[in-house]
């Protein structure tokens, strides 16, 4: 007999063994053990029935459910749950199977059973799906209409208010059974009315308002600087705890072994305990005291060897405050005209602003919701109310949104989906009496979606300046027709609140020239129109009308009297900006209007230098040889190839000569 045959026979000889062993064990087992095995088999059968019950409830198979719960001692456990805590009643509620839910409730299903995470009851799931009949059934069976989930703190009414299908019937059932129309969820204090507004559920919003929902309730307000101070303190404490002897963490969890020797690296349990302690600290209401931009600033040089500066937390200072969002602000952000109309008809204040004084009209403009912006203007929204931080008004916001810089990643473009164009909104705002000349208080934190490529600072910019930066000549003319001043420049903020990247492409201001004073004029509209912002990486981010450089500059010079040789704060002229883009046609036009091709910048570069392709910090400009030839033929000199950038050796001999920001010749005060 071969080995293979022996193996096959051996394998075959064992094939009947389980049956023989089972018979033998059955014969030898005492009566009690046999009964125990029978009970185990019965338990397995019940477990199987419970699994089938969960599936049948999910699928809406009411007859199967009825049969399974009617099997007496052998029937399914009506409250059996999966590992996530979902019972048959949860599934029936989630899918809207009212008949199944009735059978389960009659069989003793617990109406307030909660899931493992969040303790979502069947009522929450039915409300989220907008299943009004199931919601009513659960409430009649004793479900708590105000029970909140433990993770987000939402009630069933929050979820019903946002439901896409038949949400109003679910909302009505909940309100009829005592649900609080002004309940707040746990993260930001949002109400059911805010959920309805954000999801554009006008019928649900109307029902909530009729039941006493307050349209003026705001979300929680966060003062960003104190919040930053608290976060820093929490992080400091956590780092100290992780770096401390392990036994000091004993009170934060029994898993911490206070007897073990300190190994030099924290264990996962050690880190987890520190994180838990940090969370407890953040919830403790710790008072950080008085804080300011300067007290939270970092002191040090921007570059090796540079002067010490106090750098306040830049974006946090610009943001200032968050929250204070009403239901109408939620609708405005999403552009939901129907929900906004329901809210206004129900008594919402059309001008109630958020924590940073953003009104619904400004919110709509900032988010490209131009159709809703027009509707708000028609209903009497104030066109001049500005944000309290940056001072942006709806007029500026419309232009900023329309011509928002390009980004490395996709950004919302709701304005592309509107029936109204940006000119329609600008015209409506101006016709409603909007001031055409408000200036920004600060730079906009959302200017480049959090990036800083251009080095442009918008402090002091007007709507006209913003239109000029985009070469939006139609908007420029409309603004002037309504009284816009075309000669208002941007201005410099305090030194510590300036972008590190400079508008000529340098990574930081390291020219060693005196600081330009706070409040000093920076760039005029003619610089913006001629190509200001194109000297560095910003050239790849600008969104504008590239075919309108010359018409925009001509309009400024010929119709508005702009100075063809206007110097900005770094002594660039419109000619410099045209040269940096290789725009020979604009150069020739500027020369025809008396433009000076021999002008030298504060950093010591000529107009021709701007077209030579030299370095500006880590950025190398595109060379335009034909532009260099044109300018030199017109009298421009070649002074310095690379932009003055002291620490790299790219220093221009003419930098700082005739510097308007230099102290008196006999004093070196202010030199760096």
Give, region by region, the residue ranges found by the protein language model.
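N-terminal segments that cap or nucleate solenoid repeat domains
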Residues: 37-39, 46-91, 327, 331, ...
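Ankyrin repeat A-helix N-terminal signature
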Residues: 55-60, 91-97, 125-131, 159-167, ...
């Amino acid at each position: 007999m071969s080995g293979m045959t022996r193996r096959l026979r051996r394998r075959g000889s064992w094939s009947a063994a389980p049956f023989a062993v089972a018979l033998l064990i059955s014969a030898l087992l005492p009566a009690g053990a046999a009964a125990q095995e029978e009970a185990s088999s019965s338990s397995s059968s019940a477990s199987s029935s419970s699994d089938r019950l969960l599936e049948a409830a999910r699928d809406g198979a009411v007859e199967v459910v009825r049969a399974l719960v009617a099997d007496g001692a052998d029937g399914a456990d009506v409250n059996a749950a999966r590992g996530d805590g979902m019972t048959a009643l949860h599934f029936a509620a989630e899918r809207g199977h009212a008949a199944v839910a009735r059978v389960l409730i009659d069989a003793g299903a617990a109406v307030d059973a909660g899931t493992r995470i969040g303790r979502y009851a069947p009522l929450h799931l039915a409300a989220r799906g907008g299943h009004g009949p199931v919601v009513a059934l659960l409430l009649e069976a004793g479900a708590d209409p105000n029970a909140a989930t433990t993770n987000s703190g939402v009630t069933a009414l929050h979820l019903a208010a946002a439901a896409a299908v038949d949400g109003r019937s679910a909302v009505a059932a909940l309100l009829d059974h005592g649900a609080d129309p002004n309940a707040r969820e746990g993260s930001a204090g949002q109400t059911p009315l805010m959920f309805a507004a954000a999801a554009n559920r006008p019928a649900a919003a109307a029902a909530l308002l009729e039941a006493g929902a307050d349209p003026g309730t705001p979300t929680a307000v966060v003062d960003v600087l104190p919040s930053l101070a608290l976060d820093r303190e929490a992080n400091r404490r956590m780092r100290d705890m992780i770096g401390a002897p392990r036994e000091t963490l004993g009170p934060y969890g029994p898993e911490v072994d206070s007897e073990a020797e300190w190994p030099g690296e924290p264990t996962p349990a050690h880190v987890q305990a520190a994180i838990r302690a940090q969370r407890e600290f953040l919830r403790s209401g710790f008072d950080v005291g008085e804080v300011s931009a300067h007290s939270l600033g970092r002191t040090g040089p921007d570059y090796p060897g540079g002067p010490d500066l106090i750098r306040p937390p830049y974006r946090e200072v610009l943001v200032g405050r968050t929250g204070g969002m009403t239901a109408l602000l939620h609708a405005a952000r999403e552009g939901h005209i129907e929900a906004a109309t329901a809210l206004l008809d129900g008594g919402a204040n059309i001008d109630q602003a958020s924590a940073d004084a953003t009104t619904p009209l400004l919110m709509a403009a900032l988010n490209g919701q131009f159709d809703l912006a027009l509707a708000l203007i028609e209903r009497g929204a104030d066109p001049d109310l500005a944000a309290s931080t940056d001072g942006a008004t709806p007029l500026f916001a419309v232009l900023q949104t329309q011509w928002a810089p390009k980004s490395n990643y996709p950004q919302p473009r709701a304005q592309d989906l509107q029936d109204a164009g940006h000119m329609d909104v600008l015209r409506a705002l101006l016709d409603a009496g909007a001031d055409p000349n408000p200036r920004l208080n600060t730079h906009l934190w959302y200017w480049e979606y959090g990036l800083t490529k251009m080095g442009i600072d918008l402090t002091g910019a007007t709507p006209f300046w913003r239109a000029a930066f985009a070469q939006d000549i139609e908007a420029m003319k409309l603004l002037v027709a309504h009284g816009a001043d075309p000669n208002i420049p941007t201005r410099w903020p305090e030194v510590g609140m300036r972008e590190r990247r400079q508008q000529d492409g340098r990574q930081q201001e390291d020219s060693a020239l005196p600081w330009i004073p706070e409040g000093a004029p920076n760039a005029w509209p003619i610089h913006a129109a001629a190509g200001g912002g194109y000297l560095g990486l910003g050239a790849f981010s600008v969104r504008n009308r590239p075919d309108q450089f010359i018409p925009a500059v001509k309009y400024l010079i010929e119709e508005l009297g702009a100075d063809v040789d206007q110097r900005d704060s770094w002594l660039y002229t419109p000619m410099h900006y045209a040269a940096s883009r290789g725009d020979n046609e604009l150069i020739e036009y500027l020369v025809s209007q008396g433009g000076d091709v021999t002008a030298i910048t504060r950093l010591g570069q000529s107009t021709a230098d701007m077209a030579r392709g030299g370095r500006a910090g880590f950025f190398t400009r595109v060379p335009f040889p034909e532009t260099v030839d044109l300018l030199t033929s017109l009298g421009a000199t070649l002074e310095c190839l690379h932009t003055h950038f002291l620490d790299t050796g790219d220093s221009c001999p003419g930098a700082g000569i005739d510097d308007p920001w230099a102290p008196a010749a006999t004093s070196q005060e202010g030199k760096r």
